[in-house]
Amino acid sequence: MSDKNQIAARASLIEQLLSKRNFEDLGNHLTELETIYVTKEHLQETDVVRAVYRVLKNCPSVALKNKAKCLLSKWKAVYKETHSKARNSPKLFPVRGNEENSGPSHDPSQDETLGICSSNSLSSQDVAKLSEMIVPENRAIQLKPKKEHFGDGGPESTGKRLSELLDPITPMRTKCIELLYAALTSSSADQPKADLWQNFAREIEEHVFTLYSKNIKKYKTCIRSKVANLKNPKNSHLQQNLLSGTMSPREFAEMTVMEMANKELKQLRASYTESCIQEHYLPQVIDGTQTNKIKCRRCEKYNCKVTVIDRGTLFLPSWVRNSNPDEQMMTYVICNECGEQWYHSKWVCF
């Protein structure tokens, strides 16, 4: 197996172990990468830089982090050495700004020695810059969203591009921001307010992700709920409250489904709740003894049905609990003519 295939295989295995959070076996792969001769072409044609950078950011072991930092420092020296030799050939290497040419010139071998021996030789900005330089441009383009509704139209920052390369959640969060932006602008697409809606969409998504960062399933469910409520024409009060400042993006992100409902739906739910409580007060099975000794208090006819109910089987309101607590039975009456139903608490038998 060639060195390139070995490096690609090691990078793939490291990615799998990181996704399974199996950090115990990472040391063997990092040690193997230290023994393989790595060239600039290997770094650009494989995902080994991204894999080792994820170890540096996500692994809890300090020893493995130092080993990953040493590898990145060593590869940075290799890349700079190759780049300095071919500096007069601009076609081979894309220009990434003045960052590569800035700074005093120095011996690459010294960088390699310092990077391997010192665990603090590579800062987070240097690691990010290294990953940006080595990862090919076509891979970064594949991970970008198809439509860019956000941003000022200029080149993206190094940190943002690197986070998209290393974190698979970033494209999903970008898509959620786009969905929130489309839902916020569904009622009115005024161009002067476009930037304001973009800021609202970003802030709402950030607060939702903060709430459910440990449970992506709940995060997606919450985003779908927000988008559906914002697109509902009856919930136009949500956009109005955001625009007027009555409700902040954080408050909207923390709102439940019940709180986002419009007034009509809230009243309907309240009526359903009240009717269910009233029905729960009454017995489910209406059986009893036919009698003409009781006069209905509504239609004043003598055609009723009487049954005796145990107190313990019902959730009775306070007005029923006026009799002696020793009386365990309650008399329940229903009129066969008009359907009136009531409790008769003055006596328990006939």
From Swiss-Prot:
InterPro entries recorded: TF_IIS-typ, TFIIS/LEDGF_dom_sf, TFIIS_cen_dom, TFIIS_cen_dom_sf, TFIIS_N
PROSITE patterns: TFIIS_CENTRAL, TFIIS_N
Domain TFIIS central residue range list: 172-288
GO cellular component: a single term: nucleus
Domain of life the protein comes from: Eukaryota
Residues covered by region (Disordered): 88-114
Stored Gene3D superfamilies: 2.20.25.10, Conserved domain common to transcription factors TFIIS, elongin A, CRSP70 (1.20.930.10), Transcription elongation factor S-II, central domain (1.10.472.30)
SMART domains reported in the protein's UniProt record: TFS2M
A single GO BP: DNA-templated transcription
TFIIS N-terminal domain segment(s): 5-82
Entry protein name: Transcription elongation factor A N-terminal and central domain-containing protein
Protein species of origin: Macaca fascicularis (Crab-eating macaque)
Encoding gene, per UniProt annotation: TCEANC
